[in-house]
């Protein structure tokens, strides 16, 4: 009688050894999410108790660490786990290749959680969006290396026919769509075709999650179910936290580049929200387009006491709202960290173009507090845009700087058009000084009278930050000074540089004018 030795499937190739590393990185991601949520909560609690921000506390350092620090941390974790306990790499390199695929997919739940709206970690999801984007790229990179590694393995062993098997083909499909996603997510493509990028992004995510049911071996059904649950939560949240708009009024002015949209407030809309909050506006759920293309982010330029939800938008946007169509809005999302509303004593707000929609509600809130010194500075390329101040009933003093001339695109370049209401559609605000020969009053007499009645101080040319922010010197403690900037990237860069140079906290939001 002859005996034969039964070999173990994929003997020596770590077929099951990588399972635990998937659970390890998932456990690390859970701890990481808890750390982010805890750091955010504890920093704000400490801030409220001390009535001043503490930039040196460990919680503040974690909560305010640049996104690239988090990205490098996760890259180090993935690489470290990929090579842990792998001896004689020349013989066991396929273990690393297999492990990278599992590590990539087990990070998907964290990546989805970072993009949830509203965010479950306490922060504004806008704060976590850069981390979501770069973690997605890290996942794709690990997945692509995983795929290339298998092609190399099959080529060496003359087994390219394995690529035709459905389980492997599913992985190839995911890899191809992931590479395409990286291409369409590049800045030029994303800015120009954001709605299509958004649809392709969501399709690729769904494809990635579902095809892993067949591709991953051993299976990852638990991670698939968790990922599907997060996607369903996002869909349910969109339904539950949305409100149908009864009607829309468009307020326009001749020769102005901005317009005012007045949305009738839905009956069930929240009765309280923080000044400077955002809403998303899209088509009703009955429209298939609302499920395929993105809703658009706008800043609420109104208070809870108003009967309408007021939005200041740039004319000629890709997303044009019409009175003949129905719309749906989300619940308000806060932007400015809440403790600033009670601890700031000297506030300057610098806006560019439609960034005034964030500036007005915050300015009115701070200016109506007797203990706060508040100033609003607004840069516009068209003096006629100031009509929105009278339409919104702004009676507080406002400094308006009317600029002209083309600007250097490399200096004031548009940023990504990822939220077409808040982040604009590709036209810059002009911030260059008016040439000396043109510095006569650029306003008509009627316009000058209206501005005087509204306590608006009109200035020609780009503002000098050192001059307009000089009143910061009236407050000794920098911990109670706040500089808010909302506008294009160039304006934000200059204001941030001023804040850093003078030790003043800066809160910024990007608006492409």
From Swiss-Prot:
Domain FAD-binding FR-type span(s) in chain numbering: 240-368
Regions that span the bilayer: 22-42, 66-86, 103-123, 138-158, 166-186, 193-213, 219-239
UniProt domain Ferric oxidoreductase: residue ranges: 100-211
InterPro entries tied to this protein: FAD-bd_8, Fe3_Rdtase_TM_dom, Fe_red_NAD-bd_6, FNR_nucleotide-bd, RBOH/FRE
Gene Ontology CC: plasma membrane
A molecular-function term among this protein's GO annotations: ferric-chelate reductase activity
Matches recorded under Pfam families: FAD_binding_8 (PF08022), Ferric_reduct (PF01794), NAD_binding_6 (PF08030)
Entry membrane topology: Multi-pass membrane protein
Subcellular location: Membrane
Catalytic activity, EC: 1.16.1.-
Top-rank taxon: Eukaryota
Family from the record: Belongs to the ferric reductase (FRE) family. AIM14 subfamily.
Function description: Probable cell surface metalloreductase. May be involved in iron or copper homeostasis.
Name under which the protein is recorded: Probable metalloreductase AIM14
Organism name: Clavispora lusitaniae (strain ATCC 42720) (Yeast)
Lineage: Eukaryota, Fungi, Dikarya, Ascomycota, Saccharomycotina
């Amino acid at each position: 009688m002859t005996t034969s030795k039964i070999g173990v499937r994929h003997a020596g190739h770590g077929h099951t050894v990588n399972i635990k590393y998937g659970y390890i990185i998932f456990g690390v991601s859970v701890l990481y999410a808890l750390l982010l949520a805890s750091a955010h909560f504890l920093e704000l609690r400490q801030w409220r108790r001390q009535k001043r921000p503490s930039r040196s506390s460990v919680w503040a350092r974690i909560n305010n660490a640049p996104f690239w620090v988090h990205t490098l941390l996760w890259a180090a974790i993935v690489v470290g786990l990929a090579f842990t306990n792998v001896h004689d790499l020349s013989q066991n390199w396929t273990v690393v290749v297999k492990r990278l695929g599992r590590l990539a997919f087990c990070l998907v739940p964290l990546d989805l959680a970072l993009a949830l709206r509203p965010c479950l970690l306490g922060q504004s999801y806008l704060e976590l969006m850069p981390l979501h984007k770069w973690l997605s790229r890290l996942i794709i990179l690990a997945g692509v290396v995983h795929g290339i590694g298998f092609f190399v393995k099959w080529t060496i062993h003359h087994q390219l026919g394995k690529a035709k098997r459905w389980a492997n083909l599913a992985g190839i499909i995911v890899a191809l769509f992931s590479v395409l996603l990286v291409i369409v997510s590049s800045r030029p493509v994303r800015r120009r075709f954001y709605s299509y990028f958004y649809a392709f992004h969501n399709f690729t995510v769904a494809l990635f999650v579902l095809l892993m049911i067949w591709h991953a071996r051993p299976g990852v059904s638990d991670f698939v179910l968790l990922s599907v649950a997060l996607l369903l939560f996002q869909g349910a949240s969109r339904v539950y936290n949305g409100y149908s708009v009864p009607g829309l009024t468009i307020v326009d002015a001749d020769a102005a580049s901005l317009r005012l949209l007045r949305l009738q407030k839905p009956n069930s809309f929240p009765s309280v929200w923080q000044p400077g909050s955002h809403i998303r506006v899209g088509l009703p759920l009955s429209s298939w387009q609302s499920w395929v293309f993105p809703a658009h982010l706008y800043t609420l330029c109104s208070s809870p006491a108003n009967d309408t939800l007021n939005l200041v938008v740039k004319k000629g946007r890709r997303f044009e709202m019409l009175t003949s169509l129905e719309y749906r809005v989300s619940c308000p999302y806060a932007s400015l960290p809440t403790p600033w509303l009670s601890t700031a004593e000297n506030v300057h707000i610098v806006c560019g173009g439609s960034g005034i929609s964030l500036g007005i509600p915050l300015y009115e809130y701070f200016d109506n507090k007797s203990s706060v010194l508040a100033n609003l500075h607004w840069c516009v390329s068209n003096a006629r845009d100031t009509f929105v101040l009278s339409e919104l009933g702004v009676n507080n003093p406002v400094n308006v700087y009317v600029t002209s001339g083309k600007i250097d695109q490399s200096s004031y370049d548009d940023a990504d058009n990822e939220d077409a209401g808040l982040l604009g559609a590709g036209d810059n605000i002009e911030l260059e000084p008016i040439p000396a020969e043109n510095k006569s009053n650029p306003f008509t007499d009627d316009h000058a009278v209206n501005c005087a009645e509204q306590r608006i101080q009109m200035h020609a040319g780009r503002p000098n930050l050192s001059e307009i922010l000089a009143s910061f010197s009236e407050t000794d403690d920098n911990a109670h000074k706040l500089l808010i900037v909302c506008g294009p990237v160039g304006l934000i860069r200059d204001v941030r540089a001023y804040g850093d140079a003078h030790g003043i906290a800066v809160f910024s939001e990007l608006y492409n004018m």
